[in-house]
Every structure is written in C-alpha cells, then in structure tokens.
Amino acid sequence: MEKFSLINKDRSRIKVFEPFEDVSKPSPSIDAMMISYGCIYKRSIKPVMKGSRVETIEAARKEYAELLKEGWKKTSIFNSYF
C-alpha cells in the first residue's frame, strides 16, 4: 500500500492516508490506515497538520470514497513534506 493525499475544493484542507504498521505484534502487519488531517495556508509552505487517527482499512476506504463524492481531489503537491 502507498501513501496518498486528498485536498478539498477550496485548497484549504488536506488529508493524508498512509498504511499503519502495528509493531507491537510479533510479526508486524498492515491492517489499518493512519489518516492525518490539516490546513493549508499557502501553497508554497508545508501544511499545518492538526492531528491524526488510526482507522480500519474498510473505514478508511469508506471515508476516501465520501471525500471524493464531496469534490476532494487526489494530489501529490505536498508529498515531499510527509
């Protein structure tokens, strides 16, 4: 799985979806996604991340689909910051 970012229509908010490894288990596996969210003040500077949470892969897929329906777009503009 890869890391990807979504940005809203106004280009003021960003969400970053990335695989979450549970290293507390003997054999680390990826069975969850970490969703980080933040604000964009200027396109030329790093977004200000407000927080993050860990969701199941199914819940993350559902949220991703809902955001796309709301008009969010996949972006790679800020990938160098994460």
Regions found by a protein language model. Name each.
Residues M1-E70, T75-F82:
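Terminus-proximal functional modules
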